[in-house]
Amino acid sequence: MLPCLFPAYGSVVACKPSAIDRSPFGLLSQPKQTNRTLIRRPKVTKAFMAIEAMRHCSSSSSSEEGGAAATTAARSAVRERLQLAPPSPSPSPYDTAWVAMVPALRRGGGGPRFPQCVAWIQRNQRGDGSWRHAAAAHQQLGSSPEIVTERDLSSTLACVLALARWDAGSEHVRRGLQFIGRNMSVAMDDQTAAPASGSVVSFAAMLRMAMEMGLEVPAVSQADVRDRDAGVICHGGRTEYTAYVSEGLGNIQNWNEVMKFQRKNGSLFNSPYTTAAALVHNYDAKALQYLDMLLDKFGSAVPAAYPANIQSQLYMVDVLEKMGISRHFVGEIKSILDMTYSCWKQRDEEIVLDMQTCGMAFRMLRMNGYDVSSDELSHFSEPSSFHNSLQGYLNDTRSLLELHKASKVSIAEKEVILDNIGSWTGCLLKEQLLSSAMKRNPLSEEVEYALEFPFYTILDRLDHKRNIEHFDITSSQMLETAYLPCHSNEEIMALGVRDFSSSQFIFQEELQQLNSWVKESRLDQLQFARQKLDYFYFSAAATIFTPELSDVRILWAKNGVLTTVVDDFFDVGGSKEELENLVALVEKWDKNDKTEYYSEQVEIVFSAIYTSTNQLGSMASVVQGRDVTKHLVEIWQELLRSMMTEVEWRQSRYVPTAEEYMENAVVTFALGPVVLPALYLVGPKMPDSVIRSQECSELFRLMSKCGRLLNDVQSYEREGSQGKLNSVSLLALHSGGSVSMEEAVKQIQRPIEKCRRELLKLVVSRGGAVPRPCRELFWSMCKVCHFFYSGGDGFSSPTAKAGALDAVIHEPLNLSCSV
C-alpha cells in the first residue's frame, strides 16, 4: 500500500490506496497521480502525535511496507482492547486511598484491612508530591505539565489522609500537603464555578477531616473550607446522589439509607471508593467481599469503577463506528454485542441501573438487529427518572444525550415510551444548552449536533469526518472521579485518519472518471438538464464509502444522473413527440431497430441509458452468476411509463386521488434505477425470487414514499406554479378547503415518520429474504433523502449542499480541531 502522507505541519492530504483495494470490475482506470494539493497549515496538536507511528515520507523506499505495518499494528492494538477480557483498567489513586482507609477490625481498630493499598500509595507518589490517575497523567502529553485539576487535588488529599490515618509515610504526607497548598486556588475556583459535584463535596469534607487529624495544609484556613454537606443533604430527592458521594459526608450520612443502593456484587454503584467509604463508617460483609475480590483481581490498587466492562466496551464500539473504521473489527464487535444482549435479556444491573449504559445498549443492539423492546426503557419514560437520580443531580449531560439518541431508534408508528423519552430529554438538553455552565462543557457541540441532526439525516462519511476532526485522544468516559480505560485512542485516531484520507483519494479519482463519462455520453450538451453529477456521486460516497464498493458508487452516480436527465426531459425538455419516441425506444430496447430518433436530444438520452444499462448488466451478471440485464431494462421501462402517466395527467388536467398519485409517484421519484441495480453489486447473491419478493418491494415502496413526501413538502410551491400536483397540494385540494397548504405540510410529516420507522424495522430485523447489506442500501438512500430535503430543497439548489460535498470529497482533514 502506498503511503498515506501525514505532514507534521499541515492538514492530511488524500492517501493513495493499494491497487488491491480498488474495484474488481475495471470501472476505474489505474491509479493516477493527482495534481490537486490540498494542504493547510493548522497548529500542531496531539492529533498529530497520534499518527506519528503511521507517518512515512513519500521519498522513503520502505514507506509502503511501513505504512501497511503501522496500520496492522494499530488494528491489533484496537483489537486487543475489544476482547471480551480486556486489559486491566488503570489504577485509581483516589479509590485506592479510600480502600486503604478501611480498618481491619469491625469497630475500626487493628490497622488497615488492605495494607497493600497503603504500600501502593507510598510507591506511587509523583515528583511534584501529587497522586494522579494514569489518564490524567497521560493527558499532559503534548501540553503544559503545570495543568492541575480539582480531581488531582482530591486524589492527592485522599492519599494523604490514608497515609496519615495509619501513621505511614510522613514525608509523603508533607509533600502531598504542599502540592495541595500550591494549587488550592484550583479547588476554590471549581467550587465557585459550578454546583457541588461529588468530588467538590468530597474535597471540602476531606479538608475538614485533615484538619481534625491535626494536618496543616499550607495556605488553607478554616475559612477556606466550604462545607457543602448541609446543602446537599437538604436538597429533596437526592438520596442516590448523597449515597454516591458518601465518602465526603462522613458521620452526617444516614448509612442505612446508603446501603439500600447496594448491588448484588456487594458494591455501591460499582464504585470502589463509595463502597470503601461505607465500610469505613459502617461494616458490611458483602461490601467487604466486593473489595476483597477487587484486591484479589487487581493486586495492590483498584480501578475507578468495577465492573464497567459493558459500558466501556459499548463506548469503544461506538467510537469505532463514529470514526468509520468499525468494519475492520466485525468479529470482535459481534462478540461484544452478543455479550451485551445476553446481559440485556438477564436485566443485568450494569445495564438496567445506569442511564447512559442502558441508552447506548438499546440503540446499538437495535441498530445491529438484536430483538430489544422499548418496554425495557419504561423506567426512563418520565423526566422524574432523571431528576431523582444520581445523573440528574450531577446534571449528567452524557447520560441525557445517550438516552435521547436511543429514543430516535424507533421502528414502529407508535413507540410511546421512546416518544416520551425523546420529548423530555430533548427539552432538558435544550435547557442545558442555554445555561452558562454548558458553555464550558465539551459536550455542548455534540448536544447541538444531535438535536439539530437526528441520525437518520446524517450521511456516514460526513459524520466520520466531523468525529475525526473533533476526536480527543486524551478523553475518557468519567463520572465524578471515575475514569474508564482509554487505551488505544492514538491507534483509533491514526486508523480513522488513514481510512478517511485514503477514501478521499478514491473519491476524487472516481468523480474525475464520471465527469469524463458525462462528456463522452454528450449529456453535458442537453441544455434542459440539471447537472447533478457531483451531488449524486457525493450521496454515494458519503454512504457507500468502503473501497471495495467502488462499482456501486459508480452505478449509483451514473444512474442518478440519467434519472435526473429523464425527469427534466419529461418536465421541461421534451415535446410530446420526443417523449413518446423515447418511451418507444426503451420499450423495444434495440439500438439497431429501424425506429428513428425524433431528435438529437432523444438520441443522446436513449443512447446513454442503453449503453450504461447494458454495461452494468454485464457486470452485475458476472457477480450474480446469472443474466440480470432483463430486470435492469424493466426498471427503466416502468419508470418511463409512470413518467408518461404524469405527463398525460398534466396535459388532460386530470386530478388523481391521493392513492393514485402515490402509487405512481413512488416510481417517478426515480430511485428504482439507482438503488435496485446496486443490489446486484453489493456482494450477496440476489435470486430473481428475492429481487421480486414482497419484502424487497416493500423496502422499495417505503424508501420511495418517504423520499417522495420529503420532496413534495419542499417543492409544492414551485411545482404548483408549473401546474403540477403533488401530495401536499392534493391533500389540500381533496379536503374541500378545510385543510390549508400549511396544515397539509404538517399532516404530511406523519406518513413520512411512519414510512421511515417501518423501513428501519425492515432493515434491522433479522431473517427475511433480502440480505442485510442489500437492505442497508434502502436505508442509505432514505438518509440521503432526509439530508437533501430536510429544511429545504437541497438537491435543486446548486449551493445548499456544496460545503458538505467538498468536505467528503475534496477538503482534507483539518486536525487542528483535535485536542
Swiss-Prot record:
InterPro entries, sorted: Isoprenoid_synthase_dom_sf (IPR008949), Terpene_cyclase_plant_C1 (IPR044814), Terpene_synth_N (IPR001906), Terpene_synth_N_sf (IPR036965), Terpene_synthase-like (IPR050148), Terpene_synthase_metal-bd (IPR005630), Terpenoid_cyclase/PrenylTrfase (IPR008930)
Loss of function: phenotype: Severe dwarf phenotype with reduced shoot growth, reduced crown roots and growth of branch roots, abnormal leaf blade morphology, dark-green leaves, short and wide edges, leaf tips rounded and almost sterile seeds.
EC number from the UniProt entry: 4.2.3.229, 4.2.3.19
Region (Disordered): 58-77
Keyword Oxidoreductase assigned: no
Source superkingdom: Eukaryota
Protein name in the entry: Ent-beyerene synthase KSL2, chloroplastic
Organism listed in the record: Oryza sativa subsp. japonica (Rice)
Protein's gene: KSL2
